[in-house]
A protein has these predicted regions:
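Acidic, Mg2+-coordinating catalytic modules of nucleic-acid enzymes
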Residues: 313-318, 327-538
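Extended helical coiled-coil dimerization/tether regions that scaffold
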Residues: 90, 124-127, 131-224, 228-238, ...
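Switch/communication elements of ASCE P-loop NTPase nucleotide-binding domains
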Residues: 1-4, 194-195, 201-312, 328, ...
Length: 538
């Protein structure tokens, strides 16, 4: 849309579904200063009013005597259109919806620095029209002076004898056909070609040899291009970088992202780098999901996740699990429900960092119209917000009807098998778990037999210890100690997996299958896998 040249070739593949009759339009709302020369077009470009979300027409005067309304925050609506004839048309849309031509001069003044594929990265390092180097030097007469000096070279005298003879034969042939003759070689120009394209920046290597910057590594070329653009005193420069991590080490990616955020001009960046996402703490993230939906992610709701686990936003499908227990529990189930390795399928189970944070993160995904999964406890808080998220996510969000994962599993274990929960993965009674139970009972004897004998309700005691409940603690110090009890049970990823293992081993799965299986099938469907009737387990 902001190409500095009118020379742009389209093909059928540039159109949606290769349907050229449908044409295409790319439109943007841009704030432009007077230095962009937007007001010097053949037809005056009237500004729109920016209302905080979109460009709207300015307030219409009440009568003919009123002054023309001046927008408090003027913006312009620019667009590029691909016609059914495979032609490109640059236009500016007026507030009354009239469309006028957008000149190449204005587009060149705006100045786009584009870093795409490696084959295009040297454009801004050469003296072609509209390049970063061209805008930096801003010497309009340079090409003419270079052309004049080149034209002074007598090309005819530098030809070999065979070449001179071939040229004479051609001249004679043209003369016989009454065509222009008396041929000689000289400097000519052609549409799309410029003598400036042969001129570029050179830099000394370690050996002191001047080498074209275009021949250096991809990362070095990109960094050099951005430095050239930054040296240009332009108020409207727009930087577009595809895969910012290309050719750069992680520390340089981090440095580049931080640098772009401090620039007064705007940058658009695509990335598959967790380092880049984590470093963009001042940027606005937009996410493209597996269904090709693109949506904005509110910074205030994703900031913690962006910093701690940026790979959340790079997965084919991310499942936001409330905490470590849920991560381990869900991972165990998905390992058995999904065909193939989870990571190979692009499936990532992420830590939502608590119930409120998980809700906020899922709300951000829903607001962006994006596809994510979720697995959370039901703490009885914000039921309306959870209901709204559930209505949008459907079966991809699993939330217990009541309580936590530990509560729901332990509640269904047979009375005669409750002591099996006290055992560790080796099948032995875990002394630390016994200690948590004895502490809550206020007894010194940590034997399982004594604990069972003294506990008025063993199930409730295990649930309290496994969840780190502080209820009933005699003092504040005891509250702190009791709160940590959950770590001795299932408050970890390994503990979540252990809990899932015991769910199957102790016969709890059949009772929970109607609740959990729809969630697992929703994840399978998101990955393009067919529905299953049960989960394989030992």
């Amino acid at each position: 849309m902001l190409s500095p040249s009118n020379i742009l070739v389209l093909s059928e593949s540039d159109y949606w579904q290769r349907d050229t009759d449908a044409e295409f339009v790319i439109q943007a709302v841009i704030s432009l200063p007077p230095s962009s020369e937007i007001g010097q077009q053949q037809k005056f470009a009237w500004p729109w009013e920016w209302d905080g979300r979109d460009a709207v027409p300015p307030v219409v005067p009440d009568s003919e005597d009123d002054d023309i309304p001046a927008p408090s925050q003027p913006v312009y609506r620019l667009q590029v259109r691909g016609t059914s004839d495979l032609e490109v048309v640059w236009e500016i849309v007026q507030p009354n919806d009239d469309v006028d031509q957008l000149s190449a001069a204005v587009r060149r003044k705006i100045g786009v620095v584009r870093l795409g594929g490696d084959d295009r990265n040297d454009r801004d390092l050469r003296l072609v029209y509209g390049s970063a180097l061209d805008r930096l030097l801003a010497d309009k007469g340079l090409r003419a002076r270079i052309g004049q000096r080149v034209s002074e070279i007598d090309l005819q005298d530098n030809l070999g004898e065979d070449a001179k003879e071939a040229l004479e034969k051609l001249d004679k042939s043209l003369k016989e056909e009454s065509l222009p003759n008396k041929l000689e070689l000289g400097l000519t120009s052609s549409q799309g070609l410029s003598i400036g394209a042969l001129i570029g920046l050179l830099a000394e290597s370690d050996k002191g040899v001047p080498l074209p910057l275009a021949s250096w590594g991809a990362g070095t070329r990109r960094m050099a291009t951005l430095r050239i653009a930054a040296a240009t005193e332009a108020e409207t420069r727009i930087t577009v970088i595809d895969e910012i991590e290309r050719g750069l080490e992680p520390y340089r990616v981090r440095k580049l992202v931080k640098s772009l955020q401090t620039e007064p001009t705007q940058s658009f960046v695509t990335t598959h780098s967790a380092v880049a996402i984590s470093a963009a703490d001042l940027g606005h993230l937009w996410y493209l999901d597996r269904a090709c939906n693109i949506g904005a992610l509110p910074r205030e709701k994703i900031a913690r996740q962006q910093d701690r686990d940026p790979e959340t936003f790079l997965s084919r499908l991310a499942i936001i699990a409330e905490g470590p227990t849920e991560i381990g529990f869900v991972s165990y189930l998905l390992d058995r429900a999904i065909e193939g390795e989870l990571l190979d399928q692009g499936l990532r189970v992420c830590d939502g960092q608590g119930n409120p944070a998980t809700l906020g993160l899922l709300e951000a995904m829903v607001a962006g119209g994006l596809s994510f999964g979720g697995f959370a406890d039901n703490e009885g808080q914000s039921p309306e917000r959870w209901g709204a998220v559930k209505a949008n996510m459907g079966a991809l969000l699993f939330q217990w009807d009541e309580g936590s994962t530990e509560e729901n599993i332990v509640a269904l274990v047979d009375e005669n098998q409750l002591t099996e929960l006290i055992k560790n993965e080796d099948g032995l009674f875990d002394p630390e778990r016994c200690l948590t139970l004895a502490t809550r009972l206020g007894i010194e004897d940590r034997s399982v037999e004594t604990i069972v004998d003294k506990a008025p309700d063993l199930r409730a005691l295990i649930i309290a210890a496994a969840t780190g409940s502080k209820e009933g603690a005699p003092d504040q110090d005891a509250e702190k100690t009791w709160k940590k009890h959950g770590r001795r049970w299932f408050k970890s990823e390994a503990g979540g997996r252990e809990l899932a293992t015991k769910m199957f081993a102790l016969g709890v799965w059949p009772a929970l299958k109607p609740q959990i299986l729809p969630f697992l099938n929703a994840v399978r469907a998101a990955l393009g896998q067919s529905e299953i009737q049960d989960v394989a387990h030992e």
